[in-house]
Amino acid sequence: MNVSIRPGWFYHEEQDDQVKTVDQLLDVYYHSVGRNATWNLNIPIDERGLVHPTDSAVLMEVAKILQNNFKENLAQQAEVRASNVRGKDFAAAHLIDGNKDSYWATDDEVTSASVEFDFKVPTAINQFLVQEYIRLGQRVKAFTLEAFVGDEWQVVATGSTIGYKRILRFPTVETQKLRFTINEAKACPLLSNIECNCCSYD
């Protein structure tokens, strides 16, 4: 996605009060990077050859918020198990090991499966990041994310493709368990990373 922080691609002094806001840029981030796309942000240089202070202040705040949003991966505090595993080399634990070269995989004939995260204690969550092992292709066609609230599973998000990265945002849920289900895939699913966060945007 190609977006400029200002109305145009070049600096104009009369546009100093038209710089995109922090909320606008965060929205672009989550609708591009968060949906399996890239984000090319144009930042025009002013007549001094520098980024204008207004632009810089917005960018620094966006960076601060994003760093905080992804700072703590709550999934790493949970016990993770999967409904199907190809073998110990493709265990569900690879989803939270921080290694981009490892991944969870199901048996060849299995195209629908789920992974469950047990936090042991009630945990506040409002963001969920998932990545496919994209070196072997994009496979997932439909998925569901559920939280165990009270005494039942409640759907908090659904979607279709994942690809390199999908970030789901939803109202904060206080839950002890999360379940991510791949409802449909072109071939056996391969997931390399899952992160759960509690962000301040809710």
In which residue ranges do the predicted regions lie?
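Carbohydrate-binding surfaces of carbohydrate-active enzymes
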Residues: 2-90, 104, 126-127, 131-132, ...
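Short, surface-exposed beta-strand/loop micro-motifs that present aromatic residues
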Residues: 26-31, 116-117, 169
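Disordered, acidic Ser/Thr/Pro-rich linker "stalks" and the adjacent N-terminal cap
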Residues: 60-125, 131-139, 158, 162-164, ...
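Short, conserved beta-strand segments of beta-strand-rich sandwich/propeller modules, principally
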Residues: 127, 177-179
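Short, surface-exposed beta-strand/strand-loop-strand elements in extracellular ectodomains
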Residues: 138-151
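Short, surface-exposed tryptophan/glycine-enriched loops
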Residues: 166-177
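Short beta-strand-plus-loop segments that form exposed binding edges in beta-rich domains
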Residues: 181-188
